[in-house]
Amino acid sequence: MNLLGALAKVGSLTMVSRILGFVRDTIIARAFGAGMATDTFFVAFKLPNLLRRVFAEGAFAQAFVPILAEYKETRSPEATQVFVRHVAGMLSFVLVIVTALGILAAPWVIYVSAPGFAKEADKFQLSIDLLRVTFPYIFLISLSSFVGSILNSYHKFGIPAFTPTFLNISFIVFSLFFVPYFDPPVMALAWAVFVGGVLQLVFQLPWLAKLGFLKMPKLSFKDAAVNRVLKQMAPAILGVSVAQISLVINTIFASFLQSGSVSWMYYADRLMELPTGVLGVALGTILLPTLSKHAASQDTEQFSGLLDWGLRLCMLLTLPAAVGLAVLSFPLVTTLFMYREFTLHDAQMTQYALIAYSFGLIGLIMIKVLAPGFYARQNIKTPVKVAIFTLICTQLMNLAFISPLKHVGLSLAIGLGACLNAGLLFFLLRKHGIYRPGKGWAAFLVKMVISLVVMGGGLWLAQYYLPFEWVHVGGFKKAGQLCVLIALGGGLYFVSLAALGFRPHHFRRVEK
């Protein structure tokens, strides 16, 4: 298997989903703007999304995938199928309980996650109603992520990468055609979440059947391997929860700021999700099962080499994305979101949040490379300790930044916290000899810095001298102008890299 090809496949399919995600957010911004309705929906949608990351894509995947890789390497296919059935039964059992509790406790959940909403009765009640419709998404998407973890472990990377597209399609269809049929109209978005979750799960089932894993889940408390997964999940849940708790605390802080602050941070975060989703998710998707295989076979040289490959690709592609997001922040926000109810003031506030977020992009994506280095070795406690320390530091930064910088300070704290997290993980991997840097890092970094300066300077000069207008022009013209700038930035960066000796085959890596 060519890992670079697999990364390109996962990244391109994820890109399709992210582009549709921007289309969806543009449509939502045009229909609802940034105000009470969107604030309540984003809070209600954030909570099941948070639990999804904790139970499925976060803690569960960290605990499940390495043990599944161990079964693949050391056990028979029949034993692996039994293991998967038992894990599916346990996961379904937990998810039913969590979903039921979430629906019943919706008022308390909203009060804890956005206490500022309690001052406005209508806003508070609407948040509760939206949460009760969106909460079953946790059950659907967690099972979908479970299926995706199995497919990824068998190198069927494309199917799970394409699956999120269905949620965006559901959002787009409901926003365009069903809003008039709901009262209040924002309830259409909540039902779009539910339908999208159903579609994501159902789409993957035929491929699961081809692998022989589409069996009725079976609840077993006596399976030793399932108990190992549960034991690994305990610290993993704590670790993933720490990151999500940080986001919830930021929402709590933002709920006390002026109306629209939650939405400004949300839209800026959506722009950040393009590189984190395309590159970060793609790297994490490929690295965890592959590293787990090397850990199971105790091949330390291949393990370290794979981490080195991931870090180089991470820096090569993430740093220009961060520079681009910062330098092109205003063109990006106005082109994608500034229509109808989304005002120039909303665009400027979102721009400032995006610039602050961009400082942490390299940290966010490096975590996706470094953390699997621990998870694959079934060491979850170390990243948890790092995450807890980072949470404390992030909240101290929130307290320091919120008064002078408002919502921008909250965004900056998240970014700097991510960089701190990544730096500590890197230090610990080096300290324990798990990762040994390959040759040529100094020259690699110098060439990258030169290329980034050329790219950033070129984009800044282009915006200064080219007669581009971003406020009083139509969406198609803005999109055309933005494409010109993106093409210019990408061209400057990759031509500079080529001139300095970089070639695609330098990053090719083949795994069995």
What kind of region is each of these model predictions?
Residues 1-512:
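Membrane-embedded alpha-helical bundles of multi-pass transporters/translocases
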